[in-house]
């Protein structure tokens, strides 16, 4: 079938937005479909609980590596092309997991599914290149909101499947969803004409991948291996050294586009601009603040009532209790886009950070009543919708058109580091203070209160960092993206 071209578009902007935004749901599902079943995978795959945890870790590391690589390749050779590649790899991983009971095979499948992390930044960059100016903000806000909505949908869906069908259906369903996404992108989304050309920075890709693997291994395994163990300290030290060497190498590469010039994987000169650097730091913190609720709310819903804070829900019911939060993210995406259009995306981000800080603080001190928990989860999702909807616009208004995919991918990586760090902190805090309830070891109510207090502090820090971003028309006023970014584009023939 012939692919649509930039010169001969047949899709309406609305269809392009729907096709791309639905990819956010696929990404969220890839990250969440195995989480509720982690306690069962040691039995299902004949492995240990420690090994089963790698089903999450492998997906996270693979996604962190793929995102910046696919982003740069998208800027060089076509964003839609790389988006299709990422979806194809995700489908291959899902099909592999659907047909195997071997732990190592399923582990490889989860790593392949991690390629989905590169889909969202590529899709956001396509929106900037292809949509009319008046549609860009709302499209980005919707796509960002589907990240949370997908997680909220994935948890009850996982519960239904786990309680009624084989776990293989989770991977099979992901494969079917991926194929649908592939067809939709192929038929409805035109290729962006914005290219940088040049040669791919393979050495930079290997260096960044090595540094990320060391860093994320240390963050995700620190609680199990011991934060002061030689392995964890060595991984942290190794990641710092590799990052340093990688940075020196990247800065030495020329920035000229086209021809046979090797393009740096990440343009550190652009990334070091205060607007970009501080936005990425704020993204790490906001990712942490948002993920606290996601990490522990399902545990609280499923904890026995004798714990003093739990509600004794099944996997499916706990997922349904989380669903309103995900729907709030989608419902508020037009509101976030409108606020960014009128007041600028930084104002939208500051509102989101303030809402997240307040919601986490309420979770710290509020009574353990179901209505309070469900409402605060929904409010947390609203705050995340404001913050996540603003971040891509803040990034894209500070970078050249030719750098959008790479810059968005680096920002997606920053948010991933925030959520990964949150996961490690939650594990450390909830295992440090436990109580025995009916012979089962559970975190104390104080441990969960501490988690939410830390999440509130992270949101406050994100607010402060965002407030320090230099005032600039691109982030403080509702100007079209084309009037704020610095054009360094080449139109592909």
Model-derived segments and their meaning:
Residues 175-193, 209-221, 239-256, 462-470:
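C-terminal membrane-cytosol helix-exit motif in multi-pass small-molecule transporters
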